[in-house]
A protein has these predicted regions:
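Short, solvent-exposed turn/loop segments enriched in Gly/Ser/Thr/Pro and often Arg
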Residues: 153-155, 206-210, 404-410, 471-478
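A structural signal for well-ordered alpha-helical segments within the folded catalytic domains
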Residues: 43, 99-102, 180-187, 213, ...
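Serine-hydrolase-like catalytic core of hydrolytic proteins
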Residues: 90-271, 301, 310-334
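Surface-exposed helix-capping loop/turn segments at secondary-structure junctions
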Residues: 108-116, 193-202, 269-275, 392-402, ...
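Bacterial Sec-dependent N-terminal signal peptides
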Residues: 1-24
């Protein structure tokens, strides 16, 4: 009897060891040995530091590569999220919050370092103000894709420019630290993903909202040339003209305009110089900037120029892309006002173009001002940039553009569209399985979820969303019905709201003069 128990115990032990060995739970990266944890049958590496903590004298500096560690690094806890005014409530509330925030995660189904699996790198959104890496994505991993997600500095700590910082940099640049974090994280993934069974030549970067803008910026940045083969930008683009003000979300800031914002913050914090600024507690900076917009600026280094102009002359990372917007993007950012206030605001932003705007987006009642503002925000801040991206790359590049327009009215959303349609981030449950609102989906929506997630998975694997008897998605061609309209009965159609796109094309062209 004892012998039987002994043999059974030995067999169970051997089985457990074999199961553990089936996952790549320990590997070696540039900094040393690293050990992950088992999660849903896969190997999950939480909180991998890809750079030194940007604290003390490293605050407001380009990220510094992580030094080698001694022993085995236990990647079993999420790294802290960046200081921010909103709790993103990611990863089950397991994360702390501090300036020591430059971490990434890797979830891999690989059984061996030689598997050479495709890689999906997610850049979170949140207006460059809030958010946190999303940690795990079993729906992709179970399909043989390695899923990575990254943290980067946010708000003033990630994007404040300042004349002293520009002088200190040696390159006469400042701000854009959050973008430089993304660059370093992507380089780390590219250089180390083989240790997790990934193929560095099969990396797809993706993001939504500010994450999508980040993807757009990276697609034009020389700093990441050759580090990815595909890109997905959901509701994000960076094709505005370069200007001195972001009034009405109509411009990317010049470095000088961004530096002026840093000087104003210094004055508000009553700091005499940069040395004193670096000693201000991080959360005091967050509280004093609250929901102010510290965004990327055109510094001539990570963001080299007006992105529209870069794409006109073919100066960008020419890869296949999936890009798109939702039908009611602006509903999350709009509120009803009086008709007179609406018209006054339009004149303030658009000047001599105001009458054309009011003709395209009329409002006779307070309720109609909500819908008009929502549509202006959708088109000027989201849809036009996607339209410009598709047109320019299809003319000057070899990489194919797969453009979509998401228009499904669902209960599974953060903000319910008041006019029917899809609000900001409403596409994400259909791709990544997130649960928002009621979390409920109709049978038709569940079918859509299967199709949309499969498009994203196929694209990550091959660079083409098609296959598996899916509705065929033709690459974009200007003037032809090659936009995938994503709602009940997915189908190809023309660019939506073409008159509005034509207006913003002319408006932004004039602003570039």
């Amino acid at each position: 009897m004892k012998l039987k128990r002994h043999l059974l115990t030995a067999a169970l032990t051997l089985f457990c060891l074999s199961a553990a060995n089936a996952q790549l739970l320990r590997t070696t990266v540039e900094q040393g040995e690293i050990e992950g944890v088992e999660h849903e049958g896969f190997a999950l590496y939480k909180g991998i530091p890809y750079a030194e903590a940007p604290v003390g004298n490293l605050r407001w500096k380009a990220p510094v590569s992580k030094k080698p560690w001694k022993g085995v690094f236990k990647a079993d806890k999420w790294g802290d999220r960046p200081p921010q005014p909103i709790d993103p409530n990611q990863n089950g509330g397991e994360q702390g919050m501090s300036e020591d925030c430059l971490y990434l995660s890797v979830e891999t189904p690989a059984k061996s370092k030689n598997d050479k699996l495709p890689v999906f790198v997610m850049i979170h959104g949140g207006a460059f103000l809030s958010g946190s890496y999303s940690g795990t994505q079993e729906s992709f991993v179970k399909e043989g894709i390695i899923y990575c997600s990254i943290e980067y500095r946010l708000g003033a700590l990630g994007f404040m420019a300042h004349p002293e910082l520009s002088k200190e940099s040696g390159k006469n640049i400042s701000g854009n630290y959050g973008i430089l974090d993304q660059v370093m994280a992507l380089k780390w993934i590219h250089d180390n993903i083989a240790a997790f069974g990934g193929d560095p030549d099969k990396i797809t970067i993706a993001g939504e909202s500010a994450g999508g803008i980040s993807v757009s910026i990276l697609c034009a940045s020389p700093l990441v040339k050759g580090l990815f083969r595909g890109a997905i930008s959901e509701s994000g683009r960076s094709f505005w003209p370069v200007g001195e003000s972001r009034n009405g979300n109509t411009a990317m800031l010049t470095s000088k305009a961004a530096e002026a914002g840093g000087l104003l913050l210094q004055k508000r914090l009553k700091a005499k110089n940069l040395k004193q600024l670096r000693k201000v507690p991080a959360m005091d900076i967050v509280k004093n900037t609250a929901f102010e917009s510290f965004w990327p600026n055109v510094d001539g280094y990570s963001i080299t120029d007006d992105q529209y102009k870069l794409y006109e002359k073919g100066s960008y990372n020419d890869v296949n892309v999936i890009i798109g917007t939702n039908s009611d993007e602006g509903s999350m950012f709009s509120r009803p006002v009086s008709v007179s206030d609406y018209e006054r605001r339009i004149h303030e932003i658009y000047g001599s173009w105001a009458d054309q705007v009011l003709s395209l987006y009329p409002a006779k009642t307070e309720e109609e001002t909500y819908f008009a503002q929502s549509d202006i925000f959708r088109d000027g801040s989201f849809a036009w940039g996607t339209y410009a991206w598709a047109n320019l790359q299809s003319k000057t590049g070899k990489g194919k553009v797969y453009m979509y327009y998401f228009d499904q009215d669902s209960e599974n959303t953060i903000v319910k569209s008041r006019k029917g349609g899809a609000s900001h981030v409403a596409e994400m449950p259909f791709i990544y399985g997130y649960k928002f609102g009621s979390g409920k989906m109709t049978e038709t929506e569940q079918h859509m979820e299967q199709i949309m997630s499969r498009y994203w998975i196929n694209f990550t694997k091959t660079g083409n969303p098609n296959g598996d008897s899916l509705p065929f998605w033709t690459s974009y061609q200007e003037g032809k019905p090659t936009v995938m309209i994503m709602k009940e009965g997915l189908h190809l159609g023309p660019v939506q709201n073409q008159k509005q796109m034509d207006f913003f094309e002319k408006f932004f062209k004039e602003k570039r003069k």
